Regions:
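Short, membrane-interfacial amphipathic segments enriched in basic
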Residues: 1-13, 153, 196-207
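Hydrophobic alpha-helical transmembrane segments of multi-pass membrane transport proteins
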Residues: 36-41, 57-128, 148, 173-176, ...
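Membrane-interfacial helix-loop-helix junctions in multi-pass membrane proteins
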Residues: 19, 50-51, 133, 184-239
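Short cytosolic juxtamembrane segments of multi-pass membrane proteins
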Residues: 246-253
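Short helix-capping/hinge motifs at transmembrane helix termini and TM-loop junctions
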Residues: 41-50, 71, 125-133, 137, ...
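Aromatic- and glycine-rich beta-strand/loop motifs that create alpha-glucan
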Residues: 1-33
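Transmembrane helix segments
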Residues: 41-48, 161-203, 207
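Alpha-helical transmembrane segments and their short interhelical loops
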Residues: 99-174, 221-245
Length: 253
């Protein structure tokens, strides 16, 4: 059974990746908005924001990476919705394949596509002056956090992808996720925010994830932020996975 699951997932993953390679505009579109935001904030607003001794592009990049992921998962919900409405799921049910492999293929496709978009954003940031003296372990830690964050949000995307009534509804859920970094330490230090906004910003998941990635990039002590970030990512992943699988089983039953 396990062997069939991995084999079926690999085949379906190949199918999804072929769709992406035939329309690379998906990845380009995902990366364009975060890159445009990075350009605007660095070159238009960056001079007015005090981030201490850290250059603004270095300060900003962790938040932009999270926005890139939040933008990318909308396409996961979109692809799931199209497959669901197109009868692909019913066709797969009539075949001798592991049922959960269909969802895992979409999730892994999201992970691959978002990883490519993240690399593109980092390359643009390097052209804009981003520099990090972080070693290989720190970069691997950043990659691990981003992978967990992507998986958590992708399983969240599965839920509207399966249950939405329209294609617009399937992808619209990502809008609040894209907005969330604006109420965090992603763009400005939280100590510059008004009381209630600051309280919210300091206790929502994006701030701890951004702070952990920023500390890793700048080789500063990560403190408790990395554990809080991991707890948020793992917690969201567990909850969204459970809800997504429940939604999927209800849909195919």
């Amino acid at each position: 059974m396990t062997r069939h699951f991995f084999g079926d997932t690999a085949v379906l993953l190949g199918r999804s990746l072929r769709h992406i390679t035939r329309s690379p505009d998906t990845i380009i579109t995902t990366a364009i908005m975060p890159i445009a935001m990075m350009l605007m904030f660095v070159y238009v607003f960056g001079g007015a924001i005090n981030t201490g001794s850290v250059s603004y592009v270095n300060y900003l990049l962790p938040g932009i990476l999270l926005i890139t992921v939040a933008s990318g998962i909308a396409y996961t919900a979109f692809r799931l919705f199209i497959d669901m409405k197109g009868g692909i799921f019913e066709r797969f049910q009539s075949m001798p394949i592991a049922r959960s492999s269909v969802l895992w293929a979409h999730v892994l496709t999201s992970l691959v596509a978002n990883s490519i978009s993240l690399v593109v954003v980092v390359l643009v940031a390097l052209l804009m002056g981003f520099r990090s003296a972080a070693g290989v372990p720190a970069w691997l830690a950043v990659a691990g956090i981003l992978i967990l964050f992507t998986l958590a949000l992708t399983w969240l995307a599965v839920i509207p992808g399966l249950s939405a009534k329209s294609v617009e509804g399937a992808s619209a859920f990502s809008y609040p996720l894209i907005f969330l970094p604006f109420l965090s330490s992603a763009f400005v230090p939280t100590d510059t925010m008004p009381g209630l906004v600051r309280a919210f910003a300091e206790h929502q998941p994006v701030t701890s994830i951004v702070n952990a990635i920023r500390a890793l990039f700048t080789q500063q002590p990560v403190g408790a932020d990395i554990w809080i970030a991991l707890a948020w990512c793992v917690g969201i992943l567990i909850v969204t996975f459970a809800f997504a699988m429940n939604t999927y089983h209800r849909k195919i039953s």
